[in-house]
Amino acid sequence: MLNLQPIEYVGRTPSRPKKKHPNLIGGWVLLLMTLGIGFVIIRPMVPFLQSKRAHATKANAERAIGELKESKDFAKRLAAAALARTTEIVEYDSGYYDLSYPGGDIPSHKGICADLVVRSYRSLGVDLQELVHEDMAENFRLYPQLWERKEPDSNIDHRRVPNLQRYFSRYGKELENSPSIDDYEVGDVVGWRLSFGALEQGGSHIGIVVPGPGARSDEKWVVHNIGSGPEWEDKLFDYEIVGHYRFAPGRESSTASAENEAGISPTPH
């Protein structure tokens, strides 16, 4: 019978495995590398993202309207009313329509630059159709004589830019046609002369000064309809300015009274 003897182990003494600690330095390096790569990729996109927030979008219009419409300042509420027009789809139409009076309007999906101004004021309770007609009925000779008319016409007179300019100059505050942006305020009405302007408008155009969109809200933009419907654009100085007015209801005008008494003829536009 074999006599088996135990064999002595002569290798290394077994030891408990050491607990490994995480490599914190390597983790931070990886994190910093990730952030650096992200910065390099995203940084060039920042101006683009900022510009997107400053576009004349419907969302930006609604945001601006919300900020302006509750103001006690009539001019700011007028700017809100003008911006509200930009959310509507309007086909350019300068045609003659038979309108009710007062408060008459052509179909809401049609219009020109003058209609935009008339509708903006009317939404605040100021009916330029009635105001212009009443003044022309009393002082027809003081208005531009560009259409071979012998008497006022409540269907069309308030839709003609030169007539609106004349009314604003008589009953509002007529301001300098300044080249400086600082001389214009939100809610001002501006008249331009266009080289391509419609003959029935005397080559004139009209719009309302409003804030710029989003991050550009400190800028002075305009709402106008130059053929593509109501638009919110940075175009205050893109055309020759020939009229600058500030008109709010209830403001007494010494200009109109003096002109009526003196029989002063209108300034050509």
Walk through the language-model features, giving the residues of each:
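N-terminal intrinsically disordered, acidic low-complexity segments at the extreme N-terminus
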Residues: 1-12
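Short, basic, low-complexity termini and linkers enriched in Ser/Thr/Gly/Pro
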Residues: 13-14, 18, 265-267
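N-terminal Sec-pathway targeting helices
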Residues: 15-34
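...with weaker cross-activation on analogous glycine-rich loops/strands in unrelated enzymes
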Residues: 74, 137-223
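A mature extracytoplasmic/lumenal domain signature
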Residues: 130-134, 194-196, 226-227, 248
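Low-complexity, Gly/Ser/Thr/Pro-rich intrinsically disordered linker/tail segments
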Residues: 217-269
